[in-house]
């Protein structure tokens, strides 16, 4: 279902529902205004004024029409006034979120919570080292005096006016918001907005943790499973890293196969410069060097702190989908744009919904008029994702590698690094962290001039100076310099075509995105413009056959041999316009296929020089499924079709892995019927837990999952009552019920088989867990690759040694592990109880709760722990790598209950039709626009979101009037 626009939703006459105690909000009873002043909408009988609000600094009166979803529509005569009002309204509805985001980004959380939670000190240290506040200050200082700076300042002033009312007690914080005193809401500034903007770029593009973890993994794998090991079990696993860590996507779906090619590029793909590789290998330090192991392990505190910071917006597994449909493939004859970025599912939502309409007074220059709607990150003025009258746009993270970590050699006094054989003095910046309940902590951040800051060794909530004998790690990131992202975003507001939008985005440098867009002329376009570093050949001295050498997604030598040489030329940054397929889709996937051969190092530019975009692209299932749905669609696509694709919950892993599970079950039955047929399974079939009748029923269930439901990961519960759907019959509900039972069995099996197959090796290496995506790719590789081509192939068993459990004297086989994991899953189901109609359903365990930003605010979670129906969260369909993202964290437990809840997913579900007569947009955000449990707009959109429904978003004035909840005239005192 695409729209639910017939239901006006819960209404309120109060024009300031998010802050009912604001004394300047005006009369909420619809009484006549106290003066004849009106905003740009004038005196209209179909749009009576419900209240008035005074804001300092306005040049002209502004109208705010709040619709039935709590979305403000701002009508102003100039953009500066509009930004001032947007800042005010955002602070009115999201004050707590603004303050927490600001303090997180600037590294000032400990000032409030350091006594209650000392880990906030570590988090502040980690973010101060990167210096987002320093970068934002430099960025603001570099802004010329003009409209952009005026808009930033006006937005900041609007926020400040609300914060001052909070400090004075004229506006009260929402109930349940404990632990933050009113005086903490200090005045806002343009720098604060820029630091929040850079914080989001940091979360979506800074990946030093990945480089460090990757290097730790490689070092541990090579030292633990060396071919020279005296332990035969370890020796058989030599090459473990090649089977576990796969750079190629499991589903080889790319956005564009038409990237510029040339004979030189193809030649370079097949044979890199061998001399450069040999030369750099001669200089390469020993990958298992104890010194580096000590250096990497010293960053445990830093890595934990960064993980906590990321959880606010982009936890592990974040991603996004978007696509654009050309008018020629659209059922409406107009271009369509779909956008569902997958970010943290929190309360409040990460996005704030708003529309902005700027119309110059009659007789004035109308060339600067703006009519735009969509969503923005609270704290950032304007609109980030959405549409104007002519163009609609969405974005997904491009996953380009724009961060490098360098192993620095220090001089004996620790005050300089060695670079190209010469000492280069470290620069330092003093940081003072205020901490609640104790004295401030003062320390200095050391910075390598040609790379960036040294990453901190955090011990007992303080920074330990690096040991010169061990060295240090520095980080270089494209976001360490001032750039012009906000200018690029504001340019989109006035773009009249996809070409103008692309030109505006040419100013976008940090936090690379796959921007897809469509316009009223029917054209579509994709661009990934960003500052993408080019690197010297020595940074790619990698042998894909042996997994040895140097890659930018691991730790690079800091001696000057693996440096950045510039940025990728603009015309070579992946992009496309109006492709022959009639659509463009992205999902954090490899855009051009450079990693499909599992070698991220051998790409080349048309002239044959190195070309590298990254080595951590998505596993590929979402992109593949989106393309499959669009390609298979009979006839043109409608907005409803796009919404249905956004809600697709086919289990990608189920479709790939269930056939292997069924084969193992068949082989077990063959062994039971004729002992000795498959002797590796004799122990399984003799196990008391092996019940042939039950296994046959499970086999039929899993087989039917594919046959009748195409591996749909259905919730299997009534989304209004939470009761399980009946599983008998042939109706859609019964099919969903059976599919949900199969989904639960499969995912229980999945977490067990990952643990039983890979947990012993990872444990030997010192890892209690690892990336769920890497684990899934490894499992798929073990199942699907030619066995003899596996690095861990054991001739004695004609299969990978990884199937064998290192902790037992027996030699377990592939099928034994598969079936043992299934018995684990069934034993867990037995402990849950229920059968038939009462059998456990996937939706009872696969749930989502929009957790409040801080545990202190748990009563502001959606649903709260006290919710009478959904205390465990909303039941949801989907599973790992589904288009409708709902990835849980792979559990390593064998006996304890796995946690199938999830914390990230679609942060909006936007579909835009670019009709020349006026755009139409449908959307829903997870939660509501106002973070106040007393507001009717606290969780109203959550009811749509959790059922994969959206509503028609009013944009044209007649639609806004029809959806009106209140009109407020905002004017200067």
Protein language model regions, located:
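Hydrophobic alpha-helical segments
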Residues: 510-633, 709, 735, 741-767, ...
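Ser/Thr-rich, Pro/Gly/Ala-heavy low-complexity intrinsically disordered linkers and tails
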Residues: 3-37
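Glycine- and hydrophobic-rich flexible loops that cap the catalytic core of alpha/beta enzyme folds
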Residues: 356-382, 386-556
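Substrate-recognition/specificity elements adjacent to catalytic centers across diverse enzyme folds
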Residues: 32-336, 341, 347, 359-361, ...
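Charged, long alpha-helical assembly modules
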Residues: 715-825
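Second-shell loop/turn segments in exported
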Residues: 82-86, 134-152, 476, 486-492, ...
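Gly/Pro-rich active-site capping loops and adjacent beta-alpha segments
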Residues: 81-122, 126-135, 394-442, 558-619, ...
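Terminal end segments
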Residues: 596-678, 795-973
């Amino acid at each position: 279902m695409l729209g639910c626009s017939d239901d006006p939703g819960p209404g309120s006459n109060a024009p300031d529902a998010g802050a009912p105690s604001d004394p300047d909000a005006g009369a909420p009873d619809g009484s006549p205004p106290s003066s004849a002043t009106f905003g740009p909408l004038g005196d209209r009988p179909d749009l009576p004024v419900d209240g008035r609000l005074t804001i300092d600094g306005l040049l002209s009166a502004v109208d705010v029409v709040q619709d039935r979803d709590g979305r403000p529509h701002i009508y102003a005569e100039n953009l500066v006034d509009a930004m001032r009002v947007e800042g005010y309204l955002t602070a009115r509805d999201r004050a707590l979120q603004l303050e927490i985001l600001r303090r997180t980004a600037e590294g000032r959380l400990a000032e409030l919570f350091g006594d209650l939670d000392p880990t906030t000190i570590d988090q502040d240290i980690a973010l101060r080292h990167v210096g987002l506040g320093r970068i934002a200050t430099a960025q603001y200082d570099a802004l010329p005096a003009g409209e952009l700076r005026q808009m930033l300042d006006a937005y900041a002033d609007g926020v400040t006016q609300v914060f001052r009312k909070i400090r004075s007690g004229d506006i009260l914080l929402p109930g349940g918001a404990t632990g933050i005193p009113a005086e903490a809401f200090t005045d806002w500034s343009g720098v604060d907005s820029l630091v929040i903007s850079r914080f989001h770029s940091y979360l979506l593009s800074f990946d030093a943790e990945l480089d460090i973890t990757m290097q730790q993994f490689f070092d541990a794998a090579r030292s633990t499973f060396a071919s020279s090991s005296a332990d035969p079990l370890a020796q058989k696993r030599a090459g473990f890293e090649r089977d576990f860590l796969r750079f190629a996507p499991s589903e080889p779906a790319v956005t564009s196969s038409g990237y510029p090619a040339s004979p030189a590029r193809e030649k370079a793909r097949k044979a890199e410069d061998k001399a450069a590789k040999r030369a750099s290998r001669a200089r390469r330090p020993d990958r298992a060097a104890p010194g580096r192991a000590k250096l990497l392990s010293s960053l445990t505190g830093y890595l934990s702190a960064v993980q906590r910071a990321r959880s606010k917006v982009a936890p592990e597994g974040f991603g996004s989908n978007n696509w654009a449909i050309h008018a020629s493939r659209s059922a409406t004859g107009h271009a369509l744009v779909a956008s569902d970025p997958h970010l943290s599912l929190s309360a409040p939502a990460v996005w704030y919904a708003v529309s902005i309409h700027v119309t110059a007074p009659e007789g004035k220059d109308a060339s600067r008029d703006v009519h735009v709607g969509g969503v923005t990150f609270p704290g950032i003025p304007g609109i980030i994702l959405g549409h104007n009258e002519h163009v609609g746009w969405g974005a997904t993270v491009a996953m380009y590698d724009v961060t490098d970590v360098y192993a620095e050699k220090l001089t004996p006094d620790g005050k300089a690094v060695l670079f190209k054989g010469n000492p280069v003095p470290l620069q330092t910046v003093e940081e003072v962290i205020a901490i609640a309940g104790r004295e401030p902590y003062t320390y200095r951040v050391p910075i390598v001039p040609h790379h960036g800051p040294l990453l901190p060794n955090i011990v007992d909530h303080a920074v330990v100076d690096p040991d010169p004998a061990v060295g240090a790690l520095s980080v270089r990131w494209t976001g360490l310099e001032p750039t012009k992202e906000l200018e690029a975003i504001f340019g989109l507001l006035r773009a009249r075509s996809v070409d103008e939008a692309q030109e505006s985005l040419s100013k976008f440098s940090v936090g690379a995105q796959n921007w897809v867009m469509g316009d009223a002329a029917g054209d579509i376009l994709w661009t990934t413009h960003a500052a993408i570093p080019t690197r010297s050949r020595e940074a790619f001295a990698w042998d894909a056959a042996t997994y040895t050498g140097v890659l930018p997604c691991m730790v690079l030598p800091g001696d000057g041999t693996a440096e950045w040489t510039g940025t990728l030329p603009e015309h070579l940054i992946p992009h496309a316009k109006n492709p022959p397929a009639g659509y463009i889709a992205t999902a954090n996937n490899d855009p051009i296929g450079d990693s499909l051969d599992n070698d991220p190092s051998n790409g080349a530019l048309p002239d044959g020089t190195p070309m590298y975009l990254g080595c951590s692209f998505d596993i590929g299932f979402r992109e593949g499924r989106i393309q499959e749905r669009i390609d298979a669609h009979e006839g043109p696509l409608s907005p409803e079709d796009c919404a249905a694709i956004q809600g697709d919950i086919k289990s990608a892993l189920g479709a790939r892995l269930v056939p292997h599970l069924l084969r193992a079950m068949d082989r077990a039955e063959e062994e039971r019927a004729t002992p000795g047929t498959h002797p590796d399974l004799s122990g399984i079939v003799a196990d008391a837990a092996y019940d042939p009748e039950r296994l046959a029923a499970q086999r039929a269930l899993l087989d039917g999952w594919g046959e009748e439901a195409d591996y749909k990961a259905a919730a299997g519960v009534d989304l209004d009552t939470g009761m399980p759907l009946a599983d008998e019959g042939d109706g859609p509900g019964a099919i969903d019920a059976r599919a949900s039972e199969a989904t639960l069995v499969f995912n229980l099996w999945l977490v067990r088989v990952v643990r039983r197959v890979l947990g012993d090796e990872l444990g030997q290496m010192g890892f209690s867990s690892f990336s769920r995506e890497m684990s899934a790719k490894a499992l798929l590789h073990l199942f699907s690759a030619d066995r003899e081509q596996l690095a861990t192939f054991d001739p004695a068993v004609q299969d990978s040694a990884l199937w064998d459990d290192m902790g037992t004297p027996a030699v377990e086989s592939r099928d034994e592990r598969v079936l043992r994991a299934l018995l684990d899953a069934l034993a867990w189901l037995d402990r849950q109880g229920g059968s038939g109609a009462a059998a456990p359903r996937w939706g009872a365990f696969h749930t989502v709760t929009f957790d409040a930003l801080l545990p202190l605010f748990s009563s502001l979670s959606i649903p709260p722990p006290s919710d009478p129906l959904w205390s465990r969260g909303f039941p949801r369909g989907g599973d790992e790598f589904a288009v409708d993202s709902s990835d849980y964290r792979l559990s390593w437990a064998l006996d304890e209950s796995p946690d199938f809840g999830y914390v990230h997913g679609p942060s909006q579900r936007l579909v835009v039709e670019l009709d020349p007569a006026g755009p139409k947009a449908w959307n829903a955000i997870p939660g509501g626009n106002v973070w106040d449990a007393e507001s009717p707009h606290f969780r109203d959109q959550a009811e749509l979101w959790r059922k994969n429904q959206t509503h028609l978003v009013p944009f044209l004035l007649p639609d806004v009037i029809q959806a009106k909840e209140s009109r407020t005239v905002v004017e200067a005192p």
